[in-house]
Each structure stands twice: as structure tokens, then as C-alpha cells.
């Protein structure tokens, strides 16, 4: 159910020009109509919606403009011209506050925003992440340098350390740099450095503590995602033997581990392993000894399926490969919990799974990105 907020209160002042939202917040995601139509003969899909404003705890914003007038925001619709969005309704209030602080700080120190046409300038992007329990903000500066070896980059290092001291300890969680000197639209490279602050940002999901670094994937709408996690846990059978593919830092796997006989978590991003093990250490020895972590792609780790009866997947938008589905079907697994962030790929995967003997038993939608066409699907297949 939508929260009873007036349409006027949900009308974003940036909507007409900003590319961040495809429709106003008070409008149900149009793609949900297609989901309902697709399954109306077999299922009765439920759409879960949380709060519509202030939900985004994580934001990546472009930095453009000039020394005198830095712009921190998203690109205008149909262009690569950046737009300030100081009154963004979906941002956590701390993010909007942090953006204003950084703009003023850049003006004061006459710092150079990135210029796409010339590939000049220093600061390309910013990422802001709010730790829910403390309200502190982790900030990442994506700098147009290869490292901190040049005199210009050393000026930035000095200013970032000063920035940490300019505000109270209750505001910044940590200050990080990602070095990206390449002519690319890719925001982050693999080169990270913590300049100041705490090494890990911690979140608690139904009593299970999970930690993140800026290089790790995490959902932006954590409050609603926590409800999805609880439903996943309710679907996992007692004493299940589970393999989770595309596990990230283990948010799902660690959350359901208490119900399992054992759980193996697989993730391709090598940066996830460190956070996974730190979070694992927070669990009791009785639970932590059930949990194993493997690095590599899902297709390369199909041998993990041996002896399992349950698989949990949360793949990227391209979905599951045919090789993965074939390996899954040839295994002993009889329960598949599929978290999908790509409707088009899910439709194809669903048809392939059904053709190989799987039955779709349950489907729920989670509007993790109000204002967008994006719907997260939580589904249960059995055979």
C-alpha cells in the first residue's frame, strides 16, 4: 500500500528536467501492469511499496560546471549536461545536505570539476552512502588522477583531510577516493583508497550485521530491501542445503544461514570477500561454521551445487545464463529462489526454467526505486 501522502508533496521540482525519475512518485510503476498481465492466469502477484521519499541511502552523482559554480547532480533528460538537484525527494536528507556542503567547499577552494569535452578537471563523480543507524555519510571522490603521486593530487589529499575536520564527527563516516584518469563513461575503476574514517559501513538486517566498503554493491532502498530479505528467509526450508550465487558481501546468505544445514556463497567481485568474512565473524560460531565463501563467476562454480537442495540467485540485469540453468537443472536442487532486477531477462529465464521442468510457485514485486520503471521481483521455483 502507498503511504497517504498528498500528490503535491510527492511532486518533485526537478522532475521535468532530471533524468533520475521516469514518472512522478505517486504513480504506480507502469511496468507492474505488464507483470500482472503476464501472470494473471497462474498467480496473483503482490507489489510491496515502502516510503516514497527519502528512501535512497546511496547515490552516485556527476560533478560538472566550473570552479565558480560547481554542479553536483544527475544529467538532464536526453543529454550529458549535469543538473543540480538540491531538493531531490528520493534522496535521504543527509545526502542532499552533504551535496550542498561539498558544493560550498568546492567553491571556497576553487576546485576544478571534470570537463567531458576536454577530459580536464579533477573531480568526476561523487558517491554518498548513508549508514542508517548512525546517520553518518560515507563519501567517495572519483578523481581524474592515477594516484596520489602528483603535486595536484596531493593538494586534494590535504584538502580531504581538512574536510574531515571541518564538520563534527557525527556527519562524515569516512572519506574515500577512487582514481579514474581514463576517457570512459565508467564511473569507478578498481583503484580505491581510504583517506579518512572508518573502514567499514555497517547495516543490520533483522539482527544480522553486514558490512560494506565503497567497492561493494549494495541496495539503495535498504528499508524495503529488508522486507524482501525476511520473505526470502521465510521461503528457505529448515535445514536446507543452500548455494547462493551472485552473493555480493553475503547480505542474503548470512541473513538466512541460521535456518540452513550449510550455505555456500559465491561472488565474482573479489572486493566482497573481506567484508563477507568480517560480517561472518559477527555471527555465533554455531552459525558461522555453516557458511563458506567462494570467489569466481556463477558459471565457473556450478560444482558447488553438489549435495545442495536449494539455490538462491540475485543476478545482474542480464539474468542467468543458459549454461547456469542447465547446470542447475542437472543438479539435485529442487528449490530456486530467484531475485530479479531485470524484467526482460527474467521473462526469458522463466520460460527456459519452465521448459526444463521447473514450476513457478510464487512471485512478488518490490518497488525498490519509486519514480522509476524498475521493479525487483522475488520468485520461487520448485520441481
From Swiss-Prot:
Q: Name one GO molecular function term.
A: 4 iron, 4 sulfur cluster binding
Write out the residues that bind S-adenosyl-L-methionine. Answer: 219, 246, 267, 314
Q: Which UniProt keywords apply?
A: 4Fe-4S, Iron, Iron-sulfur, Metal-binding, Methyltransferase, S-adenosyl-L-methionine, Transferase
Write out the GO biological process terms.
methylation; RNA processing
Locate the residues binding [4Fe-4S] cluster.
12, 18, 21, 88
Q: What class of enzyme is it?
A: transferase
Entry EC number(s): 2.1.1.-
**Intrachain S-S bonds:** none
Q: Which InterPro entries match?
A: MeTrfase_TrmA_AS, RNA_M5U_MTase, SAM-dependent_MTases_sf, U5_MeTrfase_fam
- Source organism's superkingdom? Bacteria
Residues at the active site: 341 (nucleophile)
Pfam families given in the database record: tRNA_U5-meth_tr
List the SUPFAM superfamilies: S-adenosyl-L-methionine-dependent methyltransferases
Give the UniProt family note.
Answer: Belongs to the class I-like SAM-binding methyltransferase superfamily. RNA M5U methyltransferase family.
Task: Tell me what this protein is called.
Answer: Uncharacterized RNA methyltransferase pc1998
Give the source species.
Answer: Protochlamydia amoebophila (strain UWE25)
Amino acid at each position: 500500500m502507498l503511504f497517504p501522502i498528498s500528490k503535491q508533496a510527492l511532486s518533485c521540482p526537478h522532475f521535468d528536467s532530471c533524468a533520475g525519475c521516469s514518472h512522478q512518485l505517486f504513480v504506480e510503476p507502469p511496468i507492474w501492469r505488464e507483470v500482472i498481465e503476464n501472470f494473471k492466469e497462474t498467480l496473483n502477484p503482490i507489489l510491496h511499496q515502502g516510503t516514497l521519499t527519502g528512501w535512497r541511502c546511496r547515490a552516485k552523482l556527476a560533478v560538472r560546471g566550473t570552479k565558480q559554480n560547481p554542479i553536483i547532480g544527475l544529467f538532464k533528460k536526453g543529454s550529458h549536461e549535469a543538473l543540480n538537484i538540491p531538493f531531490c525527494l528520493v534522496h535521504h536528507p543527509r545526502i542532499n545536505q552533504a551535496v550542498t556542503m561539498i558544493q560550498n567547499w568546492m567553491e571556497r577552494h576553487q576546485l576544478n570539476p571534470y570537463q567531458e569535452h576536454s577530459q580536464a578537471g579533477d573531480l568526476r563523480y561523487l558517491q554518498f552512502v548513508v549508514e542508517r543507524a548512525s546517520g553518518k555519510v560515507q563519501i567517495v571522490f572519483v578523481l581524474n588522477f592515477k594516484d596520489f603521486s602528483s603535486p595536484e593530487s596531493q593538494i586534494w589529499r590535504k584538502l580531504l583531510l581538512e574536510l574531515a575536520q571541518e564538520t563534527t564527527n557525527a556527519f562524515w563516516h569516512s572519506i574515500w577516493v577512487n582514481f579514474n584518469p581514463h576517457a570512459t563513461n565508467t564511473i569507478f575503476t578498481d583503484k580505491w583508497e581510504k583517506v579518512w574514517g572508518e573502514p567499514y559501513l555497517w547495516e543490520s538486517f533483522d539482527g544480522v550485521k553486514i558490512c560494506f566498503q565503497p567497492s561493494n554493491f549494495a541496495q539503495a532502498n535498504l528499508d524495503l530491501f529488508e522486507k524482501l530479505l525476511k520473505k526470502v528467509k521465510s521461503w528457505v526450508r529448515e535445514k536446507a542445503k543452500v548455494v547462493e550465487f551472485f552473493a555480493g558481501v553475503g547480505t542474503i546468505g548470512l541473513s538466512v544461514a541460521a535456518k540452513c544445514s550449510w550455505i555456500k556463497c559465491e561472488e565474482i567481485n573479489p572486493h566482497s570477500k573481506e567484508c563477507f568474512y568480517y560480517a561472518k565473524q559477527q555471527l555465533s560460531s554455531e552459525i558461522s561454521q555453516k557458511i563458506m565463501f567462494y570467489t569466481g563467476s556463477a558459471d565457473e562454480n556450478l560444482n558447488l551445487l553438489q549435495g545442495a537442495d536449494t539455490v538462491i540467485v540475485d543476478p545482474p540485469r542480464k539474468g542467468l545464463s543458459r549454461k547456469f540453468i542447465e547446470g542447475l537443472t542437472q543438479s539435485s536442487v529442487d528449490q530456486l529462489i530467484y531475485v530479479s532486477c531485470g524484467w526482460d531477462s527474467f521473462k526469458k529465464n522463466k520460460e527456459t526454467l519452465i521448459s526444463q521442468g521447473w514450476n513457478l510457485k510464487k512471485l512478488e514485486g518490490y518497488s525498490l526505486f519509486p519514480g522509476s520503471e524498475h521493479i525487483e521481483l522475488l520468485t520461487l521455483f520448485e520441481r
